[in-house]
Amino acid sequence: LSVSWRPTDRLHAYATIPRGLKTGGFNEQSFSDLITTAQQQALQAQISGRGGFDSSTIASATTYKPEHSWSYELGARYALPSAGLELSSSVYLMQVRDLQLTRFVASGAGRMVGNAGSSRTLGFELSATQRLWSSLRAHLNYSLTDARFTEETAAAKKGNFVPFIPRHTYSLMISANEPLSRHLRLLGEVEYSGLGEIYWREDNTTRESLQSTLRARLGLSYDRYTLALWGANLTDNSYTVFQAASPLGRLFQTSAPRTLGVDLSVKF
């Protein structure tokens, strides 16, 4: 369901209520663990003379259910071309049932998808662009996401944050694409961006705080050719971009260090 309203040429408001579905499926990587468990229980049954592997658990151990969601969003866009101004913002609510999350299998040698109960997400997004002078523009983007479990599970308490979803993401950028002559253009941009905090586990015992990085790019374009110097993570900030617990230990992926480069591109 979608409704839009345009009271003026500059203002556009809208409301949407979509329904989402992620299909269920099978976890192929969990079969090796299942076979190992069956062999161990069969051996124990031979020794003790009782028990054994319960084949009725195969379906629950290797499959996961579909994820269903309802989303409700209200938003507006405003443009004032004469002043070089563009604004947009939205608020939304998402309710999810049988949330699908990726976890490691018991042996640690693979991953599987599992259902993690229900969740709700409240969000706010803001985007703005302002022309400062000629082709020089300022850009602002911000997003607030509050995603929490709405029921208690074996791994998470009600009210815990859903893992791998940053609460804040933002970007402040200055960009320019200025003609110097008929064939020559000056290109440049500087961006300060960040995200966090992020929880890595359903029990919320590990997290990464808000982290920011700075990047820049400066170049010249002549007809089909562009030469640019660039730098990423100029402040050389070191932080965790991914973390997961497995039976083999805790796995980390850290941010790339300060990186400098040169690009040469040709348009055909």
Predicted region positions:
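Short sequence motifs at beta-strands and strand-loop junctions characteristic
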Residues: 56, 63-68, 116-120, 132, ...
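Gram-negative outer-membrane beta-barrel transporters
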Residues: 84-96, 112-202, 263-267
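Membrane-embedded beta-barrel scaffold of Gram-negative outer-membrane proteins
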Residues: 6, 12-14, 18, 39-115, ...
